[in-house]
C-alpha cells in the first residue's frame, strides 16, 4: 500500500473572500467549498490535506516553520498578495526544505505589472497560475504522482 502523503495547503490574504471577491477573476465558489472538494479528492489520492488561510504574514510563517515537526511532505501555497512582497515567507520555505508548489487562481502575469514578480517561483517545484480553482487540483495530482517515490 502506498504511503499516505501529508500535504499542507496555505492560502494567503483575502482568499477568505472567495465567492464574494471579484467573481470575474476568482469565481463564485467559497474557500470552504473549495477546501471540502480538495479534501474529497485528497482522500482518493491517499493524501492527508491540512489547510490554513491567514491574512497575517507571521501566521503563515509560523505554520511553515511547524510543518517540519508535523511531518508535512509537501506544501501547496497560494501566497496571494504576499507573492510579490514577502521575502520572509520565501526564507521560511527555504529554511524548512519542504518541497512546494505555488498556485494562483488568476494569471499573475496577465494582470497589473506589480503582480508579475513572485519571490517564491524560483524556489518552488512548480507554479500553476491562471487555471482558476483547478490549479489546486492539478497541484494535488502532481504531488500524488511525484511525492515520496
UniProtKB/Swiss-Prot annotation:
Xref: InterPro entries: DHquinase_II (IPR001874), DHquinase_II_CS (IPR018509), DHquinase_II_sf (IPR036441)
Reading the lineage from the top rank, the first entry is Bacteria
Enumerate the active-site residues.
26, 104
One Gene Ontology biological process: aromatic amino acid family biosynthetic process
Pathway listed for it?
Metabolic intermediate biosynthesis; chorismate biosynthesis; chorismate from D-erythrose 4-phosphate and phosphoenolpyruvate: step 3/7
The alphabetical list of record keywords is: Amino-acid biosynthesis, Aromatic amino acid biosynthesis, Lyase
CDD domains of this UniProt entry?
DHQase_II
* Xref: Pfam families: DHquinase_II (PF01220)
Q: Please write the reaction equations for the catalytic activity of this protein.
A: 3-dehydroquinate = 3-dehydroshikimate + H2O
Entry-linked NCBIfam families: aroQ (TIGR01088), PRK05395.1-1 (NF003804), PRK05395.1-2 (NF003805), PRK05395.1-4 (NF003807)
What does the UniProt function comment say about this protein?
Catalyzes a trans-dehydration via an enolate intermediate.
The molecule here is called 3-dehydroquinate dehydratase
Its source organism is Buchnera aphidicola subsp. Schizaphis graminum (strain Sg)
Which gene name belongs to this protein? Answer: aroQ
Amino acid at each position: 500500500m502506498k504511503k499516505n502523503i501529508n500535504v499542507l495547503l496555505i492560502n494567503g490574504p483575502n482568499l477568505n473572500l472567495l465567492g464574494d471577491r471579484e467573481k470575474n477573476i476568482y469565481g463564485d465558489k467559497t474557500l470552504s467549498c473549495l477546501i471540502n472538494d480538495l479534501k474529497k479528492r485528497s482522500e482518493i489520492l491517499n493524501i492527508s490535506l491540512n489547510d490554513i488561510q491567514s491574512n497575517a504574514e507571521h501566521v503563515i510563517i509560523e505554520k511553515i516553520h511547524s510543518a517540519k515537526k508535523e511531518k508535512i511532505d509537501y506544501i501547496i501555497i497560494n501566497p496571494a498578495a504576499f507573492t510579490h512582497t514577502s521575502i520572509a515567507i520565501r526564507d521560511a520555505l527555504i529554511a524548512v526544505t519542504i518541497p512546494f508548489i505555488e498556485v494562483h487562481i488568476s494569471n499573475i502575469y496577465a494582470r497589473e505589472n506589480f503582480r508579475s514578480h513572485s519571490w517564491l517561483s524560483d524556489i518552488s517545484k512548480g507554479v500553476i497560475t491562471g487555471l482558476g480553482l483547478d490549479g489546486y487540483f492539478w497541484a494535488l495530482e502532481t504531488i500524488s504522482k511525484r511525492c515520496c517515490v
